[in-house]
Amino acid sequence: MKKFLCMMMAVLMVLAMAACAAKTTDTPAPAETDNKTDAVQETATEAAADGKTELNIGVLVWKYSDTYGSSVRVAMDKYAKEIGAEKGLTINLEMQDGNDDQATQNNQADVMFAAGKDHIIINLCDTSAGQYLVDLAKQYNVPISFYNKEPVDSTIVTGSNSIFVGTKPEEAGIMQGEILADLYAADPSRVDKNGDGKVATLEFEGEINNPEAIARTEYSLSTAIEKGVPCEMMTENQVANWDTAKAQEMMTAQIASLGVENIEVVFCNNDDMAIGVIAALNEVGYNLGDGGDEIIVIGVDCTDTAVEYINAGKLYGTVKQDGDAMGKANILMAINGALGKDWLDGTDYTMADDGFSIRIPYAKITAE
């Protein structure tokens, strides 16, 4: 009897232990304390740690109608697909046109940041207005990159999780000056048409307070003079806002004021303005590409239209700003930013001496 009772007790103990084990296994673990309810959405770094394979990247563009900017947009779309495929990532790009209005761009930014983008690429409408976007980036803990139009205050880049993709502001101007100096050295009479020992010069500037525009304007003139071209400014800089129609209008006014025969060289901060200048010259029989009267016009960007004009003998030269290379750099920076990696990880770029930018080199383009 005692043996029977002992056996029964042993069986009951085993059953009890099994029941406890079953209860422990079947009961869900207590939910984690929801301390993240009020926190910012998961950062890109955390997403990468979770093995994220899809990135949502926003792109804020200053205006779609800008010719060079369009080449950068096309390149970004191309490289988002190509590089994404190479890295096993699906990259969803959402682009917005700021239409050259900073208030519009700020509103677009509000929506993009609130939507939880992994990274936002920014081409400022107003180069003095970057602080608002940096503040949004900090609020939402989202990395950003500026491109092409450098913020006037570089401290907003250095003091945030951001980088600038652009060019050396002075380099394009230096190359414009060199293009003119090379022509002057080879054929002075083609530049100084009236032989008075002075080269009557106009400057068409992109916009006020834009570091790129300021440097292109300053260095094109100073480089030409340093290399022996006796340039003499005819008027104050013509600020045409990078726009073809505005440049044509302003050049028409200068022709009426100065007389086309008294203008010998026109430097333009971009090719769109150069095309506008040439349109105004065409109206008075200059730069038709027929071997007749011409004024030396030099632009920047090397757009497709500019190349056509160079080949046709209407535009003397331009400085290539590589839109394809800039678009590629934008995508590589966005991927690294979104994945919480070092900006230069897996790239061939080097950080500029300023510590907050990578710079795409320029190249001189003429028909010679």
Where do the model's predicted regions map?
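Short beta-strand elements in bilobed, periplasmic/extracellular small-molecule ligand-binding domains
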Residues: I83-G98, I225-T244
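Hinge/cleft segment of the Venus flytrap/periplasmic-binding protein
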Residues: A49, T53, G195-I208, E212, ...
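Flexible loop/hinge segments that line or gate small-molecule binding clefts
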Residues: L133-E171, S189-K198, T303-N311, L315
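Hydrophobic alpha-helical segments within soluble ligand-binding/sensing domains
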Residues: D50, Q105, F164-D196, A245-M251, ...
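Hydrophobic alpha-helical
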Residues: D110, A114, I120-Q139, I144, ...
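Bacterial lipoprotein signal-peptidase II cleavage site
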Residues: A18-A29
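Short, solvent-exposed amphipathic alpha-helices that sit
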Residues: Y68-G84, A172-Q176, P211-P230, K246, ...
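Extracytoplasmic "Venus flytrap"
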Residues: N56-A75, Y79, I83, E94-N106, ...
